[in-house]
């Protein structure tokens, strides 16, 4: 995405809810263009960020999961890695993954009444590993 690109809908975050919003948008408004801004280098939100032993949902996945892609795992209270896998599979299956702009954090949004247009400012992060001499 460049600074001149325009989309009809900008979704902030590629976690469970952001992926859901993108799938619903693509299914119900197929003529609308969209992008997802994800501040991190991977989708999944909480389920990618936190990796401590024993992390799991506190809600059953039959309720928390997507209506358009029901949770089929018999483990209703799912562990973090299973939820992350579910999110990634869903994003790929529905073509949402191609719309995610990683390492891009929305920092400002300004509404123009005259233009009937939001202008969103985002910063993009590049991760570098630089060797040094001892």
Model-derived segments and their meaning:
Residues 122-125:
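Short, compositionally biased segments
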Residues 102-116:
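A conserved short coil-to-beta-strand element within the FAD-binding core of flavoproteins
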